[in-house]
Amino acid sequence: SSGLEALKACKKISGKTKLIGVTTLTSLNNKSLKEIGYNKNINQLVSHQVKLAKKANLDAIVCSAHEVKIVKRLFKKEIITPGIRLNTKTDDQKRVVTPKQAYKNGSDWLVIGRPITKGNVRKNIQKLIDHLSQ
């Protein structure tokens, strides 16, 4: 978490390097936010974070697919989405969606880690391809 001044300072020195803002982690839900002292719900917090990123002229945003529609209204640049799963196994993630759901919600890029790397990588990639081609 960072304030506007820090974001602007990072952007100022970033040169050609793209600066990407990360909103609320997909491992958090509204209950988790309250536990760590936030008085806003996830949608409110993400909206606030995106407004800061926009003011700082960041190049992209990382957010859950659950908030992509909110982010798209506020931020017209690329959106990167973690928390992608093909099944109900969420591991430590609390807010997950399928690749198709993320695409339908408007995500530009998907971060898919454990669903590929856990187990047989080739088979897992094929499962993703099959899912996307349905």
Predicted regions and their residues:
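Short, electropositive alpha-helical surface patch
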Residues: 75-83, 125-134
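Generic secondary-structure boundary/loop-capping signal
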Residues: 22, 81, 93-94, 113
